Amino acid sequence: TPAGRLKCELFSDIVPRTSENFRQLCTGEFRPNHVPEGYKNSIFHRIIKDFMCQGGDFINADGTGSRSIYGDKFDDENFTLKHDKAGLLSMANSGPGTNGCQFFITAQPCPFLDGKHVVFGKVVDGLLTLRKMENVPTGANNRPKMAVRITQCGEM
């Protein structure tokens, strides 16, 4: 059952490299070996109610995959933007300079993530959809018990 659409705005004026990585992974423009790679048909593999929904691992679908338009990983662009509200898009990572394809969407302000994760966009339409995603039952490792999938994505 489709949960709905998330319409996002990217902060390309503040974090142009991070925004461009996300944009190309949404549109399918990233084509290593002439085959589109990106978020279409990928899942949100980790959901924690009242915290965030994490997805974007189109490699392994479990949080271990990393790829970007700049190589497997790229540096933190800057930490100008803060995790100060729900609906922010931010890069998931495994430490400094390990950005790839994974991202998360905040469910509430998360100031403890400031200076550690790069905020690069926000949900401008679809916060109700985000709430539906956030309330999907989860099991071990906060993995949703039903697939929360990106069925279509692109640029508007």
From Swiss-Prot:
Identify the GO cellular component terms for this protein.
cytoplasm; intracellular membrane-bounded organelle; nucleus
User: What is an example of a Pfam family matching this protein?
Assistant: Pro_isomerase
Name the chemical reaction catalysed here: [protein]-peptidylproline (omega=180) = [protein]-peptidylproline (omega=0)
Q: Where in the cell is it found?
A: Nucleus
Q: Name the predominant localization.
A: nucleus
Q: Which GO terms describe its biological process?
A: protein folding
The GO molecular function terms of this record are: cyclosporin A binding; peptidyl-prolyl cis-trans isomerase activity
PPIase cyclophilin-type domain mapped to chain residues? 1-155
InterPro entries reported for this sequence: Cyclophilin-like_dom_sf, Cyclophilin-type_PPIase, Cyclophilin-type_PPIase_CS, Cyclophilin-type_PPIase_dom
**What family is reported?**
Belongs to the cyclophilin-type PPIase family. PPIase H subfamily.
Protein name, entry field: Peptidyl-prolyl cis-trans isomerase H
Organism (species) = Mycosarcoma maydis (Corn smut fungus)
